[in-house]
Amino acid sequence: PDKSYNGYFMPTNNGAGATHFLMDLWGNVVHKWDAYPAGVKANLAVPGIKPEIHPDGTLWSGGLIQDWDGNVLWEFYPPRDVGISVADMPFHHDMKRIWNKKLNQWTQLIVSNRNRTKAEADAAGGDPSVSQQAYGTRLQATDYIIEVSMDKKIVWLWDFMDHTCQSVNPSWPRYVADPKDAPGKFDVHWMTDNQRPNGQAGFVRDWVHVNSVDFDEETGHVVINPKHFSDFIVVDHDMTFVSTTDFSKNIAAAAGPDGDIIYRWGNPSSWNAGQAPGWM
């Protein structure tokens, strides 16, 4: 503990009847919350407020905020609140409470994913000769980030599939001669860490696998960790948050050029700009 970053940590006992613990670096339990229902991820957003992602059956389906005493202050469940099925918006791994300066309120960034279609894969630069049947499960669980307001509206969305390129065939969509000339895009045909065991480039199930998301309030930038690319990427939230009333405009802006990656660090080989780091 003497050599660690000073502070506290929040381990979770996953599974039925899970409990979130707030502990100091010596392992002393400072406080604990019974998950509602069994939680899989929690963090201390502000004193006494604990955002949590929790599962519904076998899918991670909602997020909530509890106070210090465990009272539920806010809960978001997509099928009920926005009419989106759990299959199309399962949450996983991380949730970050942020201050949205344009809305002048707290909002929640949440990692989610959904299955994609062959048409979506083709439009993103995939090989059009691959059939939906041949894709099989390879188009399942591709990540995106949503921002949810306190009145349970999706006010912003950033999707990996909107920011892709390919250098395989100039007749396919989103062609670039060399991915290093498009550092703001993900090379669809770069073989991710998840693809290397079976040697299969292109889209694969759980293509990017985001483990964490964070927000820098000063710059208005979102930091995302797509694990299977061994990268950290930065995208501009505030530049693409263009309307406080018509949230579809924010989603469209985030899908466009202003939503491209503005900084990436970790694995230059993923956009043909250098060698893979030795610690991948």
Indicate residue ranges for each PLM-predicted region.
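Histidine-/acidic-rich catalytic cores in large beta-rich domains
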Residues: 1-280
